[in-house]
Amino acid sequence: MKVFVHGWQHKISHTRILYSLRRFYHVETPFNQNIVSGRDLESTGFAWWSGNARLINVSGKLLGAHVAHAGIMVFWTGAMTLFEVAHFIPEKPLYEQGFILIPHLATLGWGVGPGGEIINIYPYFVVGILHLISSAVLGFGGLYHALIGPDTLEESFPFFGYDWRDKNKMTTILGIHLVLLGIGSFLLVIKALFFGGVYDTWAPGGGDVRLINNPTLNPAIIFGYVLKSPFGGDGWIVSVNNMEDLIGGHVWIGVVCIAGGIWHILTKPFAWARRAFVWSGEAYLSYSLGALSLMGLTASNYVWYNNTAYPSEFYGPTGPEASQAQAFTFLVRDQRLGANVASAQGPTGLGKYLMRSPSGEIIFGGETMRFWDLRAPWVEPLRGANGLDLNKIKNDIQPWQERRAAEYMTHAPLGSLNSVGGVATEINSVNYVSPRSWLTTSHFFLGFFLFIGHLWHAGRARAAAAGFEKGINRENEAVLSMRPLD
């Protein structure tokens, strides 16, 4: 049924202008302006699917959207943590159960015993409940600011109000964010130094929770990671391999963030910065997306390669670690059967169990030689001044090393391994889904699409600042050339 009322004539005319003469309409239900004031197409220029773009000039409602979004994220975290707690099986390692949140909590030293054994899941339950309670508070705050609170904050709460073009206010907000990030960094430092410590996979005997009493504060060491090459055995910041450096790095990050935050709060942007940057809401969005993209892509590499910040006891072995574990497992087996592992040759004439690396070190032989520079807690005790120590290989291998290598051998992050030494012969899900693979892939794709979003919004912001037409010309939208649905 078509409805036409003379009182709606101005709305219909406006719709024709905004969309197309070929648009159709059955019954139009006008928005309740008391509820969605400043968030409809007529008042903002953005349709509902443009999301927060409708709230560019209504700071109070934009605050509500952000607080509600935080509530959603915290709710997922709490609910998913409780889901993992409910499905926890003590007899199986975390990485075999597909968990991605409990491993993070275990890394912080909660509920963990020697060797990475989970001895108490109650702390994880508490963390999940606290996140659910927090999400309820955030959800209420989001609804309040979205529906009841003032449209803009400038009149009611000047401290929280802002103008996107106010460069001094924007850098002050940046400074506040940096201070909060610095405080967050110091929370980890405080936990590691004073409140129970953190899990250290390098602790003697196969890993344990310990206090980090002497974090590395030498700037040459900490910033040396940043200046390292990201290629080969250098590994940039991903190459950190001890908890002292990791916690010391957080000390420096906290200091730099807080100092930078105070600087931005107390100062105004220099003239060159005023000229170089675009100062608009969409520009700030693009900067944020670019920063998040860098974080996501860095985290992707960190999860995949680093077994210090992401212990293999919780996340499963790295690819090189699983390959080396297989070579080690077969070496132990054949040595017990009487094989001379120091001199045995494989079918290619190279060492079957042990061989020389390009730099002359003794390494595991076979196809796993490509991962000769792997460092892992279960194999490091067997090294000497020139690589693997033959005397230790023959006399000092401990049962926990054998068990861990055998477990890692069958849980490679890329899938099942064959007996050659490290080649993935089955897709990941045939054997099991590695949390290390899952987190690596998810962070890579999130980082990638955040980078695309950065380019998109940066282009729009620069075009708007230069006075170009921004967005798609609505006259050329594909949908306008299609037949009406009825």
UniProtKB/Swiss-Prot annotation:
InterPro entries reported in the protein's UniProt record: PS_antenna-like, PS_II_antenna-like_sf, PSII_PsbC, PSII_PsbC_sf
Organism: Gracilaria tenuistipitata var. liui
Keyword Membrane: yes
Entry's cofactor comment: Binds multiple chlorophylls and provides some of the ligands for the Ca-4Mn-5O cluster of the oxygen-evolving complex. It may also provide a ligand for a Cl- that is required for oxygen evolution. PSII binds additional chlorophylls, carotenoids and specific lipids.
Protein name: Photosystem II CP43 reaction center protein
Keyword vocabulary terms for this entry: Chlorophyll, Chloroplast, Chromophore, Manganese, Membrane, Metal-binding, Photosynthesis, Photosystem II, Plastid, Thylakoid, Transmembrane, Transmembrane helix
Domain of life: Eukaryota
GO-annotated molecular function: chlorophyll binding; electron transporter, transferring electrons within the cyclic electron transport pathway of photosynthesis activity; metal ion binding
Family according to the record: Belongs to the PsbB/PsbC family. PsbC subfamily.
GO biological process annotation, one example: photosynthetic electron transport in photosystem II
Function of the molecule: One of the components of the core complex of photosystem II (PSII). It binds chlorophyll and helps catalyze the primary light-induced photochemical processes of PSII. PSII is a light-driven water:plastoquinone oxidoreductase, using light energy to abstract electrons from H(2)O, generating O(2) and a proton gradient subsequently used for ATP formation.
Membrane topology designation: Multi-pass membrane protein
Self-association and partners: PSII is composed of 1 copy each of membrane proteins PsbA, PsbB, PsbC, PsbD, PsbE, PsbF, PsbH, PsbI, PsbJ, PsbK, PsbL, PsbM, PsbT, PsbX, PsbY, PsbZ, Psb30/Ycf12, at least 3 peripheral proteins of the oxygen-evolving complex and a large number of cofactors. It forms dimeric complexes.
Single GO cellular component term: photosystem II
Subcellular location(s) of the protein: Plastid, Chloroplast thylakoid membrane
Chief place where the protein resides: plastid
NCBIfam families assigned: psbC
Transmembrane segments: 82-106, 147-168, 191-213, 268-288, 304-325, 460-484
Pfam families documented for this protein: PSII
Binding residues annotated for [CaMn4O5] cluster, in chain numbering: 380
Propeptide segment residues: 1-28
